[in-house]
């Protein structure tokens, strides 16, 4: 009877480990696919454009509610959040055309893309910038991925405590791992855009 109990317990542990590995493998495949695209020499121009617009979207969405009017926006927070990443002009009520969040996002995206295009124009050969983008993006992905692996390992070591709180450790690992992965990809975007 004791042996059966121990075997069942060990089976449960192995099953959980397989689930943890499945989460890690899914994330690994996504990152390796991104790395492959960079290493295959694809132009990263469209990727960087998307990163720029996504960064504007996320920062504005995080700070402005859909129902807030221009007079309710926290301009200091918007500037503090966005300008260290994308050096757009100081964001003030007078400078913003329109009164809606979507109009602000559109204006800031246009400004950010113009800044990128101005940087692009500084290079006599656009392929030089493409190569720099590939090298930089690869370094950022690799560094952030290594940090993420360490963080996921720490999460796995501490996740067993969730069982004491009557939570399924596998579900908690998946949810926390997903949040951490999203945070890592956001961080990759922001650092690349800078």
Question: Could you describe each region identified by the protein language model?
Answer:
Residues 1-194:
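Extended, charged helical/alpha-beta scaffold domains that provide interaction surfaces
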């Amino acid at each position: 009877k004791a042996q059966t109990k121990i075997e069942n317990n060990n089976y449960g542990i192995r099953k959980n480990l397989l689930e943890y590995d499945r989460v890690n493998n899914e994330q690994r495949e996504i990152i390796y696919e991104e790395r492959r695209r960079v290493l295959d020499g694809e132009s990263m121009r469209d990727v960087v454009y998307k990163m720029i617009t996504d960064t504007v979207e996320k920062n504005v969405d995080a700070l402005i509610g859909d129902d807030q009017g221009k007079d309710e926006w926290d301009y200091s927070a918007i500037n503090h959040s966005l300008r260290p990443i994308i050096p757009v002009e100081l964001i003030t009520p007078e400078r913003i055309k329109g009164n809606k969040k979507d109009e602000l996002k559109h204006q800031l995206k246009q400004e950010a893309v113009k800044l990128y295009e101005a940087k692009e124009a500084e290079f006599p050969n656009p392929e030089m910038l493409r190569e720099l983008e590939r090298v930089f993006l690869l370094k950022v992905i690799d560094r952030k991925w290594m940090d993420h692996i360490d963080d996921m390992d720490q999460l796995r070591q501490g996740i067993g405590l969730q069982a004491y709180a009557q939570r399924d450790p596998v579900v908690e690992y998946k949810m926390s791992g997903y949040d951490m992965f999203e945070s890592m990809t956001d961080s990759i975007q922001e650092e690349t855009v800078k």
